[in-house]
Amino acid sequence: DAMFHSRVLKMRTGNLDSWFCDKTTIRTLLAKKEKSSDITVIEGVMGYYDGAGFSTKGSSFEIAQITDTPVILIVNCRGISNSVGAVLKGFTTFQENSQIRGVIFNQMSEKLYPQAKKAAQELGLIPLGFLPYKKGGALESRHLGLVTADEVVHFKERISAGCARDL
């Protein structure tokens, strides 16, 4: 969400939308942002392959294809363990050239991370760490999306709260 990004990063952020913009416009918008940055991060929407209807039109996958961007997939691991390998394999092989290069495991137990890391590596992915489950750590949502950054109580503390990295 651009409001969260702007607040956390203390900079203006933008939007790339393949539903409303053609490929050239998307590449031009990204190139303008890249000129003034050392790194550019594109946050995906919904499920990685989810677009209009039962297609990839307007999906994060489509943006990755248009921009030739490597993808770091965030996988919700709450309630799963060994199935994480199947989830990763499914995402990386569902479409040819998925662009998925790395993974961050969300809501993962520290004890399970070594096995998840190995599963990712066996698929040629770079495991970039995990975020442990924290009671009260999830951001609230409502119909049509998350609450705004200004509505989150203790925003800075919650965003800064412990996460494990493996860089």
Model-identified regions with their sequence ranges:
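Short hydrophobic alpha-helical runs that function as membrane-insertion/retention elements
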Residues: 71-74, 128-130
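Conserved beta-strand segments of the P-loop GTPase G domain that flank and frequently precede/overlap
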Residues: 73-76, 104-106
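Internal gly/pro-rich beta-alpha loop/helix module
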Residues: 82-167
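ATP-dependent carboxylate-amine ligase catalytic core
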Residues: 1-67, 75-99, 111-114
